[in-house]
Amino acid sequence: MSCAPTRLHRRTLLLSAAAAAVAAPDVVRAAGNATPLPPMTEGPFYPQPAWRVRGPFAGDWDADLTRVARAGRERVAEGEHLGLELLVRDTRGRALDGAAVEIWQCDTWGRYRHPRDGALPADVDEGFQGYGEARAGAQGAVSFRTIRPAPYAGRTPHIHLKLRHPSFGEITSQLFVDGEPGNAGDFLWRRLSAAERAALAMKLQPVPAQQGARDGGLRWQSRHVLVVLA
C-alpha cells in the first residue's frame, strides 16, 4: 500500500473505531433475516482484477474507502461517512468465517471510479476509493468505512456487493438504504419481494456528534446480516 506508516496506522484506528461503533449492541442492532441474499447484477462498473492491479489506486483497495494516499498526500472522501459492519451467515445462522466480501459504489457525486464511467478526472472524488475488500473473521464479520450511498440518474442509492466462500461459491447482490424515498422508483428494487427487500435494506443510524468527531467524522453506522445458501 502506498500509505506511509503513520497514515496506515491512522486508517487502522479509524476502521477500528467504526467497527466498535457498529458493534455496540446499545447503539444499533443487526438488521437482516433468514431470507437468503437474492442474486443481482454486478452492473457495468465492477472493478475487474486486472484493472485493480493497473488502475490509479493499485494496491490500495482496503476496507477504508474514505481515505486515499497518492503522491505522498492523503485525501479524504466527500460525503457522509458510514461505518458498515456486515455479518455473513448461512440459513441456520452459522457464521461463515473466511468469507471474502467486496463492495463498490459511486462517489457522492454519482460517479464510479471505473474507466467505463467516462467521467473526467475533475468530476470524480479523488478521496474516495470506490471499491474495497475484506475477509470475514471467526464471527463471520467484516467492517468497512465508506460513505452513505448516493443516487445517480435512474438508480436509488445502493452499494454493490460480492461474496465468495467455499461453501457457496460466489454471489453478487446490492444493498439499499431502508426507507430511502428513491427506492420506490428503482427498477431493481421494484422487482424484489418484501422478504428480499428486508434482506437487502440497511438500517442506518446516526452517530452521536461527539463520537463522530472522535471517529474522524463518522456520520452513520449500520450492522447488517447477509444470509447465504451454504
Language model features: what each stretch is:
Residues 1-21:
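N-terminal secretory signal peptides and thylakoid transit peptides that target proteins
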